[in-house]
Amino acid sequence: MGGLMKKNTLILGIESSCDETAASVVKNGNEIISSVVASQIESHKRFGGVVPEIASRHHVEQITLVIEEALKQANVTMDDLDGIAVTEGPGLVGALLIGVNAAKTLAFMHNLPLVGVHHIAGHIYANRFETEFKFPLLSLVVSGGHTELVLMKADNEFEIIGETRDDAAGEAYDKVARTLGLAYPGGVQIDKLAKDGEDTFHFPRAMMDEGSFDFSFSGLKSSFINTLHNLRQRGEEPNPNDMAASFQASVVDVLVSKTIRAAKQYDVKQLLLAGGVAANQGLRERLIQEVKLELPETELIIPPLALCGDNAAMIAAAGTVSFLQGKRSGFDMNANPGLLLEDI
């Protein structure tokens, strides 16, 4: 025998930061053994957005079930695990608490190491299921609560080089969708409508020419709402496909142009797309096209659709990196809705 066999690392991931209750078993940080997600979309639909109290109640109902199902699908017991990773923040405090308390209880009962994970680090590490990371790399993180350009020079080293100064892109999508009378979650509906529309309204592209890599979407959102109201006051009903296409073109132009410029400036080896809005077809297609043209030497990594939204596999992936670096969280770990990525 040529030396000892390397032991696999098996981590249980738990995610409950917003409106998905999820658990997953991941091997070596890059192989999903099981992934279970209980979504609450139907419960929040009639309110047009996530209601924190309802989200927390659903997490309480689902958390034990999803953990049991993840272990069952992976065909493992708690004794087979090396550790537990859980989303510590950011997110809704009541929702986070359910996952954190479940993780702490299991870790205590089974004498397992506990690792707190930043939700956005999870979204970034979802790309580890596609390929190994090569540094330096740049992540465009786009979700309901975050729009950031994150530079990484090593594992678990995050530098935010650009972020939104007001609304996150996903938040703007949801608000615009509500104005059009579309069902929650609005981003998916806008993306679908945009496929059959044209950019006829030419909405503003904020901060495009500034040297900064920061974003702003509040002006675009206001411009969209005002345009829609003005047309309706004149008795006109605008083409929803064109409205959606015009809005999406503005968002995608800004996101892609700043990302490409940042990737060039920092001479990155890989460019990653991460977060819920990474599922947006318009954004995915445009990024693929621009990287081919502008950054032929840079590897573009886009996660599969199943790993764009909130899930626990990504938390286990990020948690594995921290676990192997020797990082541990104590039983005094609490939900931290304001947790900063650069502080982890």
Curated annotation (Swiss-Prot):
Residues annotated for Fe cation binding in this entry: 119, 123, 310
Any one cellular-component term (Gene Ontology): cytoplasm
Cofactor: Fe(2+)
Gene Ontology annotations of biological process type: tRNA threonylcarbamoyladenosine modification
Broad class of enzyme this protein falls into: transferase
The keyword Iron is assigned to this record: yes
Source domain of life: Bacteria
Cofactor note: Binds 1 Fe(2+) ion per subunit.
Keywords: Acyltransferase, Cytoplasm, Iron, Metal-binding, Transferase, tRNA processing
Reaction catalyzed: L-threonylcarbamoyladenylate + adenosine(37) in tRNA = N(6)-L-threonylcarbamoyladenosine(37) in tRNA + AMP + H(+)
The family this protein is said to belong to: Belongs to the KAE1 / TsaD family.
Name the record gives this protein: tRNA N6-adenosine threonylcarbamoyltransferase
Species name: Listeria monocytogenes serotype 4b (strain CLIP80459)
Gene label: tsaD
